[in-house]
């Protein structure tokens, strides 16, 4: 059968918080079958746990943030969550000693490397997929996102940025998910922002960790990073990365096609909530044979980078 996965060993790294600009220590710990994905703040006493759940997402203004009833939060979880989805990790404890996950280079690639460093352990329990059974759509003005039944996990995403540096023919991406495809084609895409917005946020004491090291930065006319883009469609690819992370907030791989136009963290989360709230829209699926799986995860020992 296709089994649940966790890490072989504990791994740790440090980085900078995007909003605070301060050093953050991130620790990833193995967890038993059916634990799920749990984010944990260790700098509060007692530590506070946030199980991966779309209902825990209560702020999507600048990132995806998990917030509990007491107002304790962990921000910027989406890139790490995308790496967990990409590597097929079902059970893990993610510990941070700050209110946010470190931003690293603004992509999911450092987290993929960290997970590969820890190694992947298969557990003696069936991996549970969420299979989409009927179309569900969520709209917000001209923006929309929808799930339709599909025997695999496909992302069909379109953005619309009227900017000289963002080519009009590089604003659409169709991606059929596999671990290998995620690592090679998606994980290295960085977040992006406009210099005017970053300057304004920093004047409000936000985005203090924002820099050319962790984002693609644009002015009105061009990309300001000396090294330019990692690949031509990096902008839409990063939006797909974000969506993979946002949708994995249900803690399970999805079998279905996600289509979106100008969607962001908020819309992705609202769609996920709408799907899970409709008992006729989805069902649990497990697979006795690896060969029969519509979603391809890499073998645990395989190096993908």
From Swiss-Prot:
Q: Per its UniProt entry, what is the enzyme's top EC class, as one word?
A: hydrolase
Tell me where on the tree of life, at the top rank, the source sits: Bacteria
SUPFAM superfamilies, per this entry?
Ribosomal protein S5 domain 2-like (SSF54211)
Name the residues that bind Zn(2+).
79, 238, 242
Q: Which reaction does it catalyse?
A: a UDP-3-O-[(3R)-3-hydroxyacyl]-N-acetyl-alpha-D-glucosamine + H2O = a UDP-3-O-[(3R)-3-hydroxyacyl]-alpha-D-glucosamine + acetate
For this protein, the record's Pfam families field holds: LpxC
EC number(s) recorded for this UniProt protein: 3.5.1.108
Any one GO molecular-function label of the UniProt entry: metal ion binding
- Catalytic residues, per the record, are 265
Classification via InterPro entries:
Ribosomal_Su5_D2-typ_SF, UDP-acyl_GlcNac_deAcase, UDP-acyl_GlcNac_deAcase_C, UDP-acyl_N-AcGlcN_deAcase_N
Task: Quote the Gene3D superfamilies the UniProt record gives.
Answer: lpxc deacetylase, domain 1, lpxc deacetylase, domain 2
Q: Which is a GO BP term held by this UniProt record?
A: lipid A biosynthetic process
* PANTHER family reported for this sequence: UDP-3-O-ACYL-N-ACETYLGLUCOSAMINE DEACETYLASE 1, MITOCHONDRIAL-RELATED
Listed name of the protein? UDP-3-O-acyl-N-acetylglucosamine deacetylase
């Amino acid at each position: 059968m296709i089994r649940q996965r966790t890490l072989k060993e504990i791994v740790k790294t440090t980085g900078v918080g995007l909003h605070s600009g301060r050093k953050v220590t991130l620790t990833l710990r193995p967890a038993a079958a059916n634990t799920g994905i749990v984010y944990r703040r260790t700098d509060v006493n007692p530590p506070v746990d946030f199980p991966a759940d779309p209902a825990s997402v209560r702020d999507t203004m600048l990132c995806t943030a998990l917030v509990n009833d007491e107002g304790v939060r962990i921000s910027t979880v989406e890139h790490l969550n995308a790496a967990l989805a990409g590597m097929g990790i079902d059970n893990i404890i993610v510990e941070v000693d700050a209110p946010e996950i470190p931003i690293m280079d603004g992509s999911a690639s450092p987290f993929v490397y960290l997970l590969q460093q820890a190694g992947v352990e298969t557990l003696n329990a069936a991996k549970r997929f969420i299979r989409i059974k009927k179309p569900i759509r969520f709209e917000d003005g001209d923006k929309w996102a929808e799930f339709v039944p599909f025997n695999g996990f496909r992302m069909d995403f379109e953005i619309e940025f009227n900017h000289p540096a963002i080519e009009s023919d590089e604003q659409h991406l169709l991606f059929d998910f596999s671990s290998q495809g995620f690592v090679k084609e998606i994980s290295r895409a960085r977040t992006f922002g406009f210099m005017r917005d970053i300057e304004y946020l920093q004047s409000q004491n936000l985005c203090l960790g924002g820099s050319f090291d962790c984002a693609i930065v644009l002015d009105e006319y061009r990309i300001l990073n000396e090294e330019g883009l990692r690949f031509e469609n990096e902008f839409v690819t990063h939006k797909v990365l974000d969506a993979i992370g946002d949708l994995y907030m249900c803690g399970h791989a999805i079998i279905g096609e996600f289509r979106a136009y100008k969607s962001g963290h908020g819309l992705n989360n609202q769609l996920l909530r709408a799907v899970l709230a409709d008992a006729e829209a989805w069902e649990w699926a497990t697979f006795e044979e690896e060969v029969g799986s519509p979603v391809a995860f890499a073998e645990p020992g395989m190096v993908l980078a």
